[in-house]
Amino acid sequence: MTRTQKEKMLAGEMYNAADPEIQADLLAAGAWLKRYNSTLGDSAEQWHLFLRERLGEVGPGAVIRPPFHCDYGFNISIGAHAYMNFNCVILDVAKVTIGDGTAIGPAVQIYTADHPDDPEQRQAGLQLGRPVRIGKHVWIGGGAIILPGVTIGDHAIVGAGSVVTRDVPAGAKVMGSPARVRG
């Protein structure tokens, strides 16, 4: 049985992003984001209700301050009382899991989207995704970038402006570009 491009995307396999089903999901997410981002002056409770319309899982008390940007939304799970400040971007072609009580600063970017090394595959529009997992009670400073396939352990701290290219152990403090364990 042949799998759809969306099924391949969700399985972390190479897929064609120009597929009509995938494009329809992008358009639906874009329409939702337009509505969500127009709620800038609303309460955290109102934002929470909006998030439950689109995101895969939304824990009690979770907040994402608009403006916010994502590819699809349905691949994002945000835990109880997790907080994302404004101008965050999540490219969620694969699962993004954000643990309970995690605090994410403004303009943080989380990427699951990846591209093949082969230029012919890239030119053909093929891409893939690798999931990002962020543990419980993590603090990610403003402007940090989390690359595809990274896991950040519970209670870790990512310094502002850091580029996280590899896994971060639980309780570690990382900073820099690329992010390295410090102190």
Positions of the model-derived regions?
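Short beta-to-alpha loop/turn elements within the nucleotide-binding domains of ABC transporters
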Residues: V150, S162, V168
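Short arginine-rich
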Residues: R35-N37, R166-G171
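Flexible, glycine/small-residue-enriched loop-and-beta-strand segment within the central core
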Residues: F68-I78, Y83-T151, A172, S177-G183
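Terminal amphipathic alpha-helical/low-complexity segments used for targeting or macromolecular assembly
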Residues: M1-G61, A179
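Short secondary-structure boundary/capping segments
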Residues: K6-E7, R54, A124, P131, ...
